[in-house]
A protein has these predicted regions:
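Glycine-rich phosphate-binding loop and adjacent beta-alpha segment
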Residues: 164, 220-293, 326-330
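NAD(P)H dinucleotide-binding glycine-rich loop of Rossmann-like/cofactor-binding domains
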Residues: 14, 45, 78, 84-149
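N-terminal Rossmann-like NAD(P) cofactor-binding module of classical short-chain dehydrogenase/reductase
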Residues: 86, 144, 190, 213-214, ...
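Short amphipathic alpha-helix with an adjacent loop that forms part of the alpha/beta core around
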Residues: 197-207
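Mid-domain Rossmann-like dinucleotide-binding core that forms the NAD(H)/NADP(H) cofactor-binding site
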Residues: 118-195
Length: 330
């Protein structure tokens, strides 16, 4: 089969089309003939050497796919060959065939294309768990979402608004991106290049602060987030686009305001832990796609052989929404 190899890692130019053996599904897994694969920031980090795959995972890039099941392990009963699914994968998505846990597969929501479905798993597993479970967002609360125009960001905006019933503030890096966030449901979108977002959040909330912050930036954003939270607020850290260290960290406001500072990664969780996220997604979120209350947005699609260009676009941060690789669209 064809797949994308990144050799010893490095800049996007290391990504090359290669030939390799087709994976064999292990117990509890299915083999998917990949039609489309989503491109995500962790793929870029893995390629550059700063996010190695966990033990036992495929070394091939790609954490989400959509396509047709062609084989199942003997113990798999919930899916069969011929079923068309989207799936969260532990790796291996940038390939013509990818093995994935059966419990991490979801049907294509009615009304969405296979290409659109490939853009769902990584974002929605991440967002549902971190906003609803770890962030404990409740109806009537306020949430600040950083990076609202990216895949995680616009998914979180919609989830918080439609399922969470919250007031949503978000940050974005341009007027165009801010407008996109508003179209996705954000009540207020702040251009962080032109506005002091922390000062604006203070004004918008009457200096009360927000109940939840979902952050992918870290670095000097952390203490700004802490100061932007209300009493009993929750800061959920899911990435660090700046740095993982916190300059000028001060624990006192966390203690005074009784804040919860939590964080998570998705890829290193067990199969069972990820399956526990898939179940409520199918019950509570997938019907909202089918009713048109939730949307996905694929900004650009590249052929598998042009994975380099897809990564260059991801690293430029010029995109809005999702980037997808076309593998074997059928």
């Amino acid at each position: 089969m064809r797949y994308i190899d990144y050799g010893d890692g490095g800049p996007p130019g290391v990504l090359k089309l290669a030939e390799g053996p087709r994976p064999v599904p292990k117990a509890g897994e299915v083999l998917i003939e990949v039609a489309y694969a989503g491109v995500n920031r962790p793929d870029v980090l893995q390629r550059s050497g700063s996010y190695p795959p966990p033990p036992g995972a495929s070394p091939v890039l790609g954490l989400e796919v959509a396509g047709r099941i062609v084989e199942t392990a003997p113990d798999v009963t919930e899916w069969k060959a011929g079923d068309v699914v989207c799936a969260l994968t532990p790796g291996g998505g940038y390939a013509e065939y990818c093995a994935a846990p059966a419990a991490h597969c979801l049907p294509i929501p009615r009304g969405l294309s296979v290409k659109e479905a490939a853009s769902l798993p990584e974002n929605w597993f991440t967002v549902y768990d971190n906003v609803m479970t770890r962030g404990r967002l409740k109806a009537g609360e306020t949430i600040l979402i950083h990076g609202g125009s990216g895949g995680i960001g616009y998914s979180a905006i919609q989830l918080a608004k439609v399922l969470g019933g919250a007031t949503v503030y978000t940050t974005a890096g341009s007027a165009e991106k801010a407008e996109f966030c508003r179209r996705m449901g954000a009540d207020v979108a702040l251009n962080y290049r032109e506005q002091d977002w922390a000062a604006e959040v203070a004004k918008l909330t009457g200096r009360r602060g927000v109940d939840v912050v979902l952050d992918m930036v870290a670095g000097d954003y952390v203490m700004k987030n802490v100061r932007s939270l209300a009493l009993e607020g929750r800061l959920v850290q899911i990435a660090f686009l700046k740095e993982n260290r916190i300059p000028d960290f001060d624990a006192l406001p966390i203690m005074i305001k009784r804040l919860t500072f939590t964080g998570s990664t998705l890829r290193r969780r067990t199969v069972e832990q990820k399956a526990a996220i898939a179940r409520p997604l199918r019950v509570h979120v997938w019907p909202l796609f089918e009713s048109g209350q939730l949307r996905t947005f694929v900004y650009r699609t590249f052929p598998l052989a042009e994975a380099r260009a897809a990564h260059e676009l991801m690293e430029s941060s010029q995109h809005i929404g999702k980037i997808v690789l076309e593998v074997k669209p059928g």
